[in-house]
Every structure is written in C-alpha cells, then in structure tokens.
Regions:
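Long, low-complexity serine/threonine/glycine- and acidic-rich segments characteristic of extracellular
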Residues: 1-25, 171-239
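Proline-centered linker/hinge motifs at extracellular inter-domain junctions
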Residues: 13, 146-151
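Proteolytic processing hotspots in large secreted/extracellular or virion-associated proteins
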Residues: 29, 43-46, 67-113
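Predominantly extracellular/luminal regions of secreted and cell-surface proteins
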Residues: 45-68
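Short, solvent-exposed loop/linker segments at the N-terminal edge
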Residues: 86-88, 158-164
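Surface-exposed loop/edge segments in extracytoplasmic proteins
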Residues: 114-123, 188-194
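C-terminal beta-strand-rich structural cap/linker in extracellular carbohydrate-active enzymes
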Residues: 129-148
Length: 239
C-alpha cells in the first residue's frame, strides 16, 4: 500500500508524490524452544494458566491474584523468571524445572528481586523434574550444594568436665541450603535437644539421668536439605 500526496504552488502547478508504506512487522512462526519468551503476559484472575516450555512448566490457578495482572515470564535453558515485584500472591503457583545436571546435591534455588538467593526445593519427581509450590515470584535456577553441615560445641571442649554447667550447647549450621534434620544420642540413648534456629543452636538441660553417669558419649548427626550429612562424637564428664 502507499500514500498519494498532491502538492500545488501559487501559480497552480501541481505535483503528485507516492509514498510507499513499509510493513515493519514481519510475520513470524512461533517456535517451541528453550528461549521462548512470554514477556508482560497478561494473567486474567478468573482463568487457570499452564505454561509449558522445553525444560520447565508453570501452573497459575485462578484467583491467585486480587485482579488481572501482568507477569514478565522468561524461560531459559538454565533458569526461569516470573517477575512482577508489585503484586502479592494469594495461592501457590506450581513450578516444575528439569534437572539436567544430575549431580549429587542439586537443588532448585530462588533469587528475589533484590538478588538474595535461597533454597527452594530438592524434591524430584520420576521424570527428574524439581517440583515446587510457592507464593514467591522471582528467578528459579539449579545449584549444587556439596558442603556438609557444621557441628561444633558451644560451651565445652571434647573431654571437658561439665559438672558445674546446667546446659550443653552446640552450633549447627548449613550456609547454603539449611538444616533439614538432626539427631542426638547420649550413651546410645536418643535425647531430645531443643533447636533455636535463629541462633543456629542446639541445647539440652541436664537432668537426673546424668547423676549416675560419670563419662558420657554424645553423638550428633545433622543433615542439610539436599542430603549432605555430618556426624560427630564428643565425650564429656559429670559427677
């Protein structure tokens, strides 16, 4: 198509000019590949949504938000972004991400809008996808944690006398994925320690059980969220 412009001067001379209209938008065939981008996807709040990519899936149930919203959804080979820092979620969205690395200690990590990273999930299904239900928008990607948790005594050294102390305390810490579980035995008997997670501290208040036990062996096992374990044995004395 084209525009036709007619120009005339004072003397009545006329000139016609044809200006072609160039179509700057080319038709493109959508491809189902790992770099498919759904930028600024409008999500209608009364509908369910399923996004299926080569290595990931996103399910957004209806009424996840208070109203219709726009999400910046980008899928890459090694990560997926679901972004809008201004909208809260009132239902969980479901994310499935293929674990191509297949390394011991792999997990799905999360990065928020401020760049802070944290553990998201280590749950794998039978197709080797990490599964996650979450109310957090941001970037999800695979990391590997190969570092065992830390166990160290807080208020004694191995072989110390603890007759004058009311508590026995340990620091347990996993800097990457966090603590999943811990177990403590004293003299081959399971003992219930209290866990103060904000202080990364395990502690136990001595009771009458220790009055008849001069030498005591304590065994601690700590496991992180991807299965890395640390086991330590200490000895302490009381009279």
């Amino acid at each position: 198509s084209e525009y036709l412009i007619e120009i005339s001067d004072i003397a009545g001379n006329k000139t016609k000019i044809k200006i072609p209209i160039l179509n700057s938008i080319k038709e493109t065939k959508l491809k189902n590949d790992e770099n498919l981008i759904e930028s600024n996807k409008k999500i209608k709040n009364d509908l369910d949504y399923n996004f299926n990519f080569k290595n990931s899936k996103i399910q957004i149930p209806k009424n996840t938000f208070l109203k219709d919203v726009k999400l910046n959804i980008k899928n890459f080979e090694d990560s997926i972004k679901i972004e809008n820092p201004y909208v809260p979620l009132f239902k969980n969205i479901i994310i499935d991400f293929l674990n191509n690395k297949n390394s011991k200690g792999d997990y799905l990590a999360y990065r928020n809008f401020d760049g802070v990273e944290s553990f998201a999930s280590s749950k794998l299904d039978n197709k080797n996808y990490f599964n996650l239900k979450t109310k957090s928008l941001g970037t999800y990607f695979i990391k590997t944690d190969s570092i065992n948790p830390i166990i160290k005594p807080n208020n004694f050294n191995d072989g110390d006398w603890m007759s004058k102390k009311e508590l026995i305390k340990f620091t347990i810490l996993d800097k990457e994925t966090g603590i999943k579980s811990y177990q403590v035995k004293i003299n081959d008997k399971w003992i219930l320690f209290e866990y103060e997670y904000k202080k990364n501290e395990l502690f136990y208040r001595f009771d009458s059980y220790f009055k008849n036990n001069r030498e005591n062996k304590i065994e601690i096992t700590v496991e992180d969220m991807v299965g890395n374990k640390t086991e330590k044995i200490f000895t302490f004395y009381r009279d």
